[in-house]
């Protein structure tokens, strides 16, 4: 007995601890908190922050473009070269020079030598000829060496046709475009979060409505059992309530599955698994604070999509300038200084102008101009589409506001009708079908009210996102004259 009591005590403690843990792990969250968490922690946000920083660094990396470039070079090489040096001309010149020198000297000694001068001259010239003839007509020279030559070189563009400034401009435009892309992604995340958060609230309301209907049908069924036992109604009438109760139970099961699925999607979006309670309810603003004409006129100044497409047009225009610059000559200065013991150096100015490369640069310019034109047209088309979305979303939001007022009146009428049908049935003046229809009508109106509020929330979100001001969505939750669906 003591062992069983101890085991029971431990089991109770374990159950209590698990219940306490589940309560502690459960988390309630408002829409404001959910948006803050999503924009801070989501993988998409982190990825676009990294891409934005990368674009900014690339733009900063090109700030020094156009400054002199200094390189340290080391060349290590060995060479072997064989040359055939012709010596024929050298031999002829040497023989002629020696012969002329000997002849002039003998002529100076003509008086002393007398008749022996000419034979002596011929003999010496023959000796010179024979001696020079020993020299080959050509000689092979072999050159070999191993060299390590360190140098410092410098190049500086003097004129590039505008390519330097265009490259800097394009890099800055890409950095700005990356910022707009990050902002656009944040707006998209807000829209996705609104959809997931308030869909979970919608499913919660549908679950509550189905639970209300199930409880009511269960109560009607129990009352019908009592009335059948007392003989006031037939078995067929009682079975009508039983079928209605079963249908209500099936609808409740479906609603419960939908609510759990929506909660899972929201937790997955927020990278959590503990969110079970949402504190920001569905809502409908009674008054429309936005003017349609102002929205249609001002959206190009706020829409990240339009601004990004305009940035694409500016990038296309920079490409046109770059293609034109590629047709122009370039001018540059250069220099090199040898760091070995010889200390050789060279400085100069060079020019380059491409005469033929196989690429039709004029067609490249035409292609770039067409791309710019296409970008302008696509921007205008995007404006038309956004105008249509703004108009449709504005109309849907206004219709949802009007429907909400009608639904509130219908709810009161449906509640009164159910009360009357229940009294009529008890007095045997009404049928079971009338009570069931009245109950279903009331439950349906509750569900329709929640659906209409969700429609308003999503229409408002689509309107603000198209306009480029979805970050203001939170301000509409706490506006005066707002009805909440709880």
Task: Identify the role of each PLM range.
Residues 35-41, 91-135, 272-331, 473-486:
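Amphipathic alpha-helical coiled-coil scaffold segments and their short linker/junction regions
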Residues 7, 71, 76-99, 450-486:
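Acidic, low-complexity, intrinsically disordered peripheral segments
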Residues 2-4, 29, 57-59, 180-302, ...:
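Periplasmic alpha-helical coiled-coil/stalk elements that build and connect Gram-negative outer-membrane
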Residues 47-62, 185, 189-210, 219, ...:
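Amphipathic alpha-helical coiled-coil segments
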Residues 36-46, 53-68, 114-119, 141-144, ...:
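A glycine-/polar-enriched beta->alpha junction
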Residues 76-80, 158, 337-341, 353-355, ...:
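Transmembrane beta-strands of outer-membrane beta-barrel pores
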Residues 72, 328-339:
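Transmembrane beta-strand segments that form the barrel wall of outer-membrane beta-barrel proteins
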Residues 51, 312, 336-346:
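Solvent-exposed loop/turn segments connecting transmembrane beta-strands
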């Amino acid at each position: 007995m003591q062992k069983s009591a101890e085991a029971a005590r431990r089991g109770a403690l374990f159950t209590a601890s698990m219940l306490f843990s589940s309560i502690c792990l459960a988390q309630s969250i408002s829409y404001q908190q959910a948006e803050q968490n999503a924009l801070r922690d989501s993988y998409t946000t982190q990825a676009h922050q990294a891409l934005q920083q990368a674009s900014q660094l690339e733009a900063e990396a090109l700030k020094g473009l156009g400054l002199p470039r200094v390189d340290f070079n080391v060349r290590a090489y060995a060479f072997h070269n064989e040359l055939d040096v012709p010596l024929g001309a050298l031999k002829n010149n040497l023989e002629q020079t020696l012969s002329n020198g000997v002849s002039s000297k003998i002529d100076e000694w003509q008086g002393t030598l007398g008749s022996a001068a000419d034979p002596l001259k011929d003999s010496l010239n023959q000796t010179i000829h024979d001696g020079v003839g020993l020299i080959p007509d050509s000689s092979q020279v072999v050159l070999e060496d191993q060299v390590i030559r360190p140098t410092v070189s410098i190049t500086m563009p003097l004129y590039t046709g505008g390519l330097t400034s265009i490259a800097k401009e394009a890099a800055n435009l890409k950095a700005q475009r990356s910022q707009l892309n990050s902002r656009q992604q944040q707006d998209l995340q807000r829209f996705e979060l609104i959809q997931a958060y308030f869909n979970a609230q919608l499913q919660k309301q549908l679950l509550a409505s189905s639970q209300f209907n199930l409880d009511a049908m269960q109560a009607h069924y129990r009352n019908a059992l009592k009335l059948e036992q007392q003989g006031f109604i037939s078995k067929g009438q009682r079975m009508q309530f039983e079928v209605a109760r079963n249908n209500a139970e099936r609808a409740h099961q479906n609603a419960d599955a939908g609510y759990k699925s929506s909660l899972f999607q929201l937790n997955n979006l927020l990278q959590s698994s503990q969110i079970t309670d949402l504190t920001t309810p569905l809502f409908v603003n009674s008054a429309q604070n936005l003017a349609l004409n102002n929205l249609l006129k001002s959206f190009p100044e706020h829409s990240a999509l339009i601004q990004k497409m305009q940035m694409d047009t500016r990038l296309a225009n920079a490409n046109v300038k770059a293609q034109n610059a590629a047709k122009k000559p370039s001018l540059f200065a250069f220099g090199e200084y040898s760091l070995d013991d010889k200390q050789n150096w060279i400085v100069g100015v060079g020019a380059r102008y491409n005469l033929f490369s196989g690429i039709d640069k004029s067609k490249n310019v035409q292609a770039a101009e067409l791309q710019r034109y296409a970008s302008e047209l696509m921007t205008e088309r995007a404006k038309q589409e956004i105008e249509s979305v703004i108009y449709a979303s504005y109309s849907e939001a206004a219709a949802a506001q009007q429907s909400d007022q009608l639904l509130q009146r219908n709810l009161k009428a449906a509640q009164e009708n159910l009360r009357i049908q229940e009294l009529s049935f008890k007095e045997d003046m009404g049928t079971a079908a009338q009570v069931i229809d009245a109950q279903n009508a009331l439950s349906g109106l509750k569900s329709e009210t929640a659906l209409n509020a969700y429609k308003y929330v999503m229409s408002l979100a689509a309107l603000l996102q198209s306009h480029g001001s979805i970050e203001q969505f939170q301000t509409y939750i706490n506006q005066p004259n707002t009805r909440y669906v709880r």
